[in-house]
Amino acid sequence: MNGETLTGLLKKGQMILAQAGIKEAGLDAWLLLEYVTGKSRAYYFAYGEESVTESVAERYLELISRRAGHIPLQHLTHQAFFMGHEFYVDKNVLVPRQDTETLVESALECMKAVKNPYILDMCTGSGCILISILKERADAHGTGVDLSDEALKVAVRNARTLEVAEHAEFVQSNLFSEMQNIVYGTEYMKRTAVKDTVKMTECENSNRNYSRAYDMIISNPPYIPTAEIEDLMDEVKLHDPRMALDGMEDGLYFTGLSRNRHRIILFRVVGFI
């Protein structure tokens, strides 16, 4: 690989991905080149014949090989863009989808007249929905809930990186089952800063009643019927977490989560999306 240039490396990556049947072979090859080299597209067009080091070429072709194996691009770069923000993602969370932005936009529209809204994001995953709302509404606070502790680690990381940690709290719970034991954001962040865990624990002030009224519950739960998962593209069925996809027999299992909410959640203004 001596004397490999940016242009030559990109062409090689495009060819490998195209032969592997990757739909966006050209774009993905470019994005991986940008990720590995740190060079912008403008730099590439100006200095495409510039040589790259052997280590850079090897790293690039390694990622190209993994992408050719249908590992999602975002799992390779650990970057996903949603509502204009960059989120960290890995194999433990769904990659944020652009069409989910309409859910965030609808929530923001519904809460226009609500001052200091409190939001519950059920099945939070990477936290992209809740965090995006908090970025748009500086007066808002929210709780993100997920069954997966590994997913919650990702959500906490994103809340810190995007500077909304003081407005967010995260709870490990099977839907509403543990919601009586909400861990407040400040205490939660202190705990995870010391120990890399998101296991459900109560704050030191354990005599507090953590039930509260939410202005909105928002959720993008698993909705794919079990039998249809095998028909999905490899990037999804082989690499996205199964529990984030599987909506059980008819795909509607988790839409029933609203039936149980009244036991522990009080509504003030807006409602359930």
Question: Predicted regions span which residues?
Answer:
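Non-membrane alpha-helical structural segments and their capping/turn regions in soluble enzymes
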Residues: 7, 149, 252-256
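Short glycine/threonine-rich catalytic loop with a Thr-x-Gly-x-Asp
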Residues: 96, 125, 251
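A short N-terminal interaction module
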Residues: 2-52, 56-60
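Mobile active-site "lid"/loop adjacent to the S-adenosyl-L-methionine
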Residues: 223-253
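Conserved AdoMet
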Residues: 34-109
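A general structural signal for well-ordered alpha-helical segments in protein cores
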Residues: 10, 29-30, 60, 73, ...
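Conserved Class I SAM-dependent methyltransferase catalytic core
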Residues: 249-273
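Conserved SAM/SAH cofactor-binding pocket of Class I
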Residues: 101-198, 202-231, 257
